[in-house]
Amino acid sequence: MRKSAIIPALIVGALLARVEAGDSSPQLADSLERKVAHLRENGQKARPDPRPTVLTDEEVDAYMNSGRLKVPEGVSDIHLSTTVGEATAVAKVDFDRLLRDVRKNNMLWQLFTGVHDVKVRCGVWGKDGMGNVHVQNVWLDGHEIPRVALEFFLEHYIKPKVPQASLDSRFRMPVRIHTATVTKGKTTLTQR
């Protein structure tokens, strides 16, 4: 299974903790990489080991900022934190870099310029092999964007290019992950 297939599980396992930059970041990113490799290998077995795999917010945060995961150009300084059933992501978004090629095709994109703080809070859970992500709130520079505006933007400008895009996503979790339980500071994944 490709690394990119594990990303939905990481999101469901969600993640988002502010980690102080320090000497432990490479070790934390390595730890997450080993856990992802274990999940992949375990998922290929006829009878996967059902013991849980715990992903800490700190590991996910270190991995997301290590350069090992391809993120869109213009998105940086990603931080994740989890509480019971929720994940919150914060990132710096340079809209000039992110929308460089799209802007010329649509006037609406010209409204987005400069570097901004974007924060997204989601309800996340996984049960019976299905992952669920429900976007609850989105903030731009501390100002909450009304859901109706998010829905309009998604419907008219994102879905034509990415038909599966949604504020409420349900998907089969990869590598035979059966449950994803999100609690304070960690996500626990079990496989079947």
Model regions: which residues?
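Bacterial N-terminal signal peptides that target proteins for export
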Residues: M1-I7
